[in-house]
Design a protein with these regions (language model features):
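Structural signature of tandem-repeat unit edges
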Residues: 1-7, 17-29, 39-52, 62-75, ...
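Consensus positions within tandem repeat domains that build extended binding/scaffold surfaces
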Residues: 9-14, 31-36, 54-59, 78-80
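Acidic, glycine/polar-enriched metal-coordinating patches/loops
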Residues: 84, 105
């Protein structure tokens, strides 16, 4: 993706059946349903500078085992991380606002999600 890209629009990877790993650099916003219903994806790495995860931006990815989030997140919609793999690990910078936001989002999930401070 071009370095100048700052926003991943709504539904950018919706239902991407071949997507196995996603590492995006330089973005500030992920729109709604960006990584939704991607059955083969296992890992997502998002860059420092990312400020917002939209509604259900990462959801319904049953084989997703690891998400790496930056310290710069200011907003994470409450519907993120739902319907992903049991045992999902969300890697966050220890003590960051991102860690606080993620812990709040996962409070009501009905399966095992682990926050991994690094």
């Amino acid at each position: 993706m071009p370095e100048s890209l700052k926003i991943i629009e709504d539904q950018a990877f919706l239902g991407a059946t071949a997507l196995r790993k996603l590492e995006i650099n330089g973005i500030e916003t992920m729109g709604d349903y960006c990584i939704y219903g991607c059955p083969k994806i296992k890992e997502v790495r998002l860059p420092e500078g990312l400020k917002e995860l939209g509604e259900s931006a990462i959801e319904n990815c049953e084989n997703l085992t690891d998400i790496y989030l930056p310290s710069t997140l200011e907003t994470i919609d409450e519907y993120n991380f739902d319907l992903c793999a049991d045992g999902l690990k969300i890697h966050v910078p220890a003590g960051s606002n991102t860690e606080t936001l993620v812990r709040k989002v996962i409070e009501n999930l009905e399966y095992n999600v682990e926050v991994v401070p690094e």
